[in-house]
């Protein structure tokens, strides 16, 4: 990994949204809150996102596009940006991972890796 790639820390919290899910219809809604922390020495701007979402049936969905939740935030050194979004799975368990396409003030582009995280209804996994 490059110095730029290691300057970004990503924390994830997930939540199963039971009241908006319908297991009988194979619809499981999950919310995830992402915190992106800039540990580097210069501002970076989040330009793109890429998600790989796999449910427990090994069905793969890929989501990519500009920014996150309609924004392309600039994250100053020693600060964080947080947002919440969601996804629907056909199974009660899945895994998400991906990356953010970032750019420095000097125009240097790099990818900040989003480590794999679980989406699971409570009590399913021990």
UniProtKB/Swiss-Prot annotation:
Stored InterPro entries: ApaG_domain, ApaG_sf, Uncharacterised_ApaG
One BP term from GO: error-free translesion synthesis
Domain ApaG stretches: 2-126
Transmembrane regions listed in the UniProt entry: none
Protein name according to UniProt: Protein ApaG
Originating species: Shewanella woodyi (strain ATCC 51908 / MS32)
Name of the gene encoding the protein in the UniProt record: apaG
